[in-house]
């Protein structure tokens, strides 16, 4: 305001300046494509006509114009925002850049294999240091995998337990089948507890090894009682066994929720006092009433819970073990959203590269990083260090490294 306006309002020298009031409006700056043009000196002899050229700057991929920023944009588009490559092709064309989906697919395969795989392998080795991990799997179609059309392949996911909020690791692995050989190989150097659903292959691994414990998922058990309750007439639901069991599981979860901010030792102690008696009572009820069960849905729910009892009780023996595998299901959700959009992967190499890139993307998100900026940083730094015999530089690229540029981290909510 002008001095005249202030004098009119307050009188001569009748005011003092306070801190400014601030208003904000947000502007959006659209993406744009720029060309980095490098000029290389070319020289010819005046006597015999032979030519020499200066050194070209090293490219990210030999014979390709792709840069770290462009590759990061493709990765962010497909593997974070679930945009199929044909739509990215159309989007880039609107910005004046003509690149085919086949070119982009080839870039993803080569970048995954040549650069990002080294960080993936490093994260894999670090996952072994966690006392509790989680595992899950989801089907995926691969068009050219040497089998008949419609044959299911699988994307397996392994992640650090969600009781460890810092230094999260989420790793995908593509395999053609769902048999036990795949987690057996992936977890061959792991000792600890793995939280899973009730899929038998995990129990097979536990029987083979003394250093691996499988913990069960209470959400999968609860889901079967939900399904059993759904077939009971509404007016009789509150009198049904399904309802009583679900109320007991709800009580267990409510008490568990109150322990989330405790240390592992305190959580275990409180579980023994407040939750174990409820679990004991629940399984006693299931065993007592198993022979009285009527509907097929309820029989299935009773059978599942009783068969899984050993695994469902593991969380009562270790404060780091969660009650369910929800964290691994959340970790695989990004892949499932993308799968609905692009429906199938073209080749086995594409599936393997997708597993690597999804792993980096989901691990970045879990550690509060901005995936695009993280991809660009990795694709700038890793190529420069690939000839290093010492791989310690990978520690500086981990999502929790303090040496990462600050711009890669998501800002705290205002």
PLM region spans:
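Helix N-cap / beta->alpha transition motif
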Residues: 1-2, 217
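Carboxylate/His-rich catalytic cores and anion/metal-binding grooves
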Residues: 2-63, 67, 99
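Catalytic center-proximal scaffold of phosphoryl-transfer enzymes
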Residues: 41-44, 49-414
